[in-house]
Amino acid sequence: LYMYKKHPYLRDKLSIAQRAKFKRGTDVGILARTYFPNGVNMTPASPSQFGKMFEQTMKNLNDPNINVMYEAIFIYNDTLIMLDILVRDGEKWRAIEVKSSLSLSETYYKDAALQYYVLNGCKVPISDMQLMYVNENYVKNGEIDINELFVFKSVKEYAEQQLDIIDENVNKFKDIVNLNNAPRVNIGTQCFTPYKCDFLGHCWKKVEDNSFLHTTAFSDKDLFSLYNSGIQNNKGFKRFLDPLSTEMYQLDALEQDTFYINYKKFYDLIGKRTESVAFLNILFYSPAIPLLDGHKPYQEIISAFSILSNESGETTEWNCFDDYSKMEEGLKTLTEELKRYEKVVYFSPQNINLMMQRYNIIESKDVLFKIINLKDVLKNSDFFYKKTKYDFSLKTIYEGLFPSESIFEHSRIILNATSDNELERILVGQDMEEENKYLQKAYKFLLK
């Protein structure tokens, strides 16, 4: 909080993936407004207008012609909130915070409780404080049914129970913001929980690239405990390690700027060798609001795929960016192509096997064994490189295998989180084919 207030210029740049997630949340929030139409949008033109819009919001509460407000601004005890939706409910108001997720986390409850604290401080008569989120059981059938797409959860009772502790915390935070210097806080698990901190680059600037903090065999809690107890170099850390332990192998890889893998596990998992291998790259799009009849929120759509034949070097490509309803055609093509090979290798955070079962691409469970997610194989083989702790992607693994080379990998996470087809076209194009070539090279290298 102190850094956001006093040194915002030190904040790490938002990744494309994170920006896309924010965009998804915004899109869902705007759609949620149609559940309560004809509202007054209180979004200020700039931060300098917050005070003015707060005053206008308070005036609107007493205007009988205004029944709904979007992004209503309230300020209490130096704490500002922008409430997603505020709906008149008789003599009181129904406060609604919109979430684009399928379930509610503790963080969402705390967020709503803070909003209720400010509303309560502003003496707004609240009939209920609710979280509005996406119904995981909704199935599209024709036009989107906004009444079925969203579900509500009352959190007013929870929020009321949190008023005292929130007031205490707000006053503590105000004291922190008023400090002349940034509070001294050791790096630790809070850097990544519940979300990755936006000032990681600043706070971690003294941590060496080959620090034992980047290892994965120990828990983060244990690593930070050692680091903050004064053991801040690898030499001191080694005193706690078995020379033949995975931890020691990872540390050696860090210091030699190379990778580590348990080849025994790798060969057991990778299966028999064959030249009849297809390298598969599938692009998923998982829209929060289903686009196709029969689909649920966040159900994946196969929007593109690329298959590289190991033997011939030929590539088969397909996409349905212009019309997602053509996905069924692509599934048939994909099914026929995969039948030609003894082994199919892909690299993805998604479980493609489950997806293929869902769409009946795999008719026999025996076929599952020829489809291999190299990401899972490497993780289960204890693969480690200095960058893989926080980014276990084909890009970082490739850099570990081939230090003098660097690749650009289109991110499925990015593309799953955005509906921007232009972005998809720009990133996918030849990148899917190129990524398959990188996957092929990495696969062959590891088999040597």
What are these regions (language model features)?
Residues 1-91, 220-253, 417-421, 434:
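Metal-dependent nuclease catalytic cores that hydrolyze phosphodiester bonds in DNA/RNA
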Residues 67-72, 80-84, 95-98, 107-173, ...:
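Conserved DEDDh/DEDDy metal-dependent 3′-5′ exonuclease domain
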Residues 74, 265-338:
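Conserved RNase H-like, two-metal-ion catalytic cores of nucleic-acid enzymes
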Residues 88-92, 206, 309-313:
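Short acidic-glycine loop/turn motifs at beta-strand connectors
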Residues 144-209, 401-448:
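Acidic, Mg2+-coordinating catalytic module of metal-dependent nucleases/exonucleases
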Residues 187-194, 198-234, 268, 322-327, ...:
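Helix-loop elements that line ligand-binding/catalytic pockets
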Residues 206-207, 287-290, 355:
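Short helix/loop capping segments that flank catalytic or ligand/cofactor-binding pockets
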Residues 231-289:
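Long, highly charged low-complexity segments
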